[in-house]
């Protein structure tokens, strides 16, 4: 999946001679949005888009995602022909309320924890910290314990308790590797420290990629199994994202944290910080990882897309779904 990000305030998206361009502020500089782009992420509140540019983008299958200052998607423009089949959604509505939904929720949490283990092992090797291997073992034991439980006795509270136990050890490890100047003490999406804000912004980009993949696979992003369904809340998108957070966002931000200068302006990341975070996360989405299901190394964005289709297929056929386990 190819993504183009617009961060600069005052940018205009226009159509010229069949091409879609971004014009930055008052300058005459025009940047062509390549025609093979899948998604344009608009990450500034002061960007204008012409209706002609929207029409041309729609014909090319390009959608626009708008992020708020925290990086959360708040709106999306996409072509009306994404996926016209209703079979997947009918199965989704029928299966998610019973045993299938509980099994799927368990698999999502299990996969999230396993991918956290993979990142901690990678960091242990990268930072040459033997103590991190012990942390990886502790988190892996939580995943093993969860794996052994009968899904029929699981509810959301039990699953969240496993996720919380793993997260405590995981985020303590991440915090120990970061400079004290960032003020990061653990994951809190409401915290105003620099690294939590960078994580929020990176996750916002990941949300937009995952939601697009689910929509194109024919799934309803608003009916999930782990996050409580609520009007206007993309519960399935939030569920699906959980499996990819560690590898897609946490990894690139942790290993590049000393290369980027994060700064706050008016209680939010400034423009340069958002550009840096977006660049790092998007570059990582183009990196190849071993996708356990296929035993092949593929671009992370393609793995996300492929896994959404696999989830849709399993739901449509009533088959057991296996999460997106990755190897760095």
Regions found by a protein language model. Name each.
Residues 27-28, 36, 58-61, 65:
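An N-terminal structural lobe/cap that precedes and organizes the functional/catalytic core
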Residues 52-56:
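A short acidic, amphipathic alpha-helical/loop segment
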Residues 45, 69-72, 219:
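An acidic- and aromatic-residue-enriched active-site/binding cleft used to recognize and process polar
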Residues 34-48:
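Extracellular/luminal Protease-associated
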Residues 40-43, 62-68:
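Short hydrophobic alpha-helical runs that function as membrane-insertion/retention elements
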Residues 50, 70-76:
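Short gly/pro/ser/thr-enriched loop/turn and capping motifs at secondary-structure boundaries
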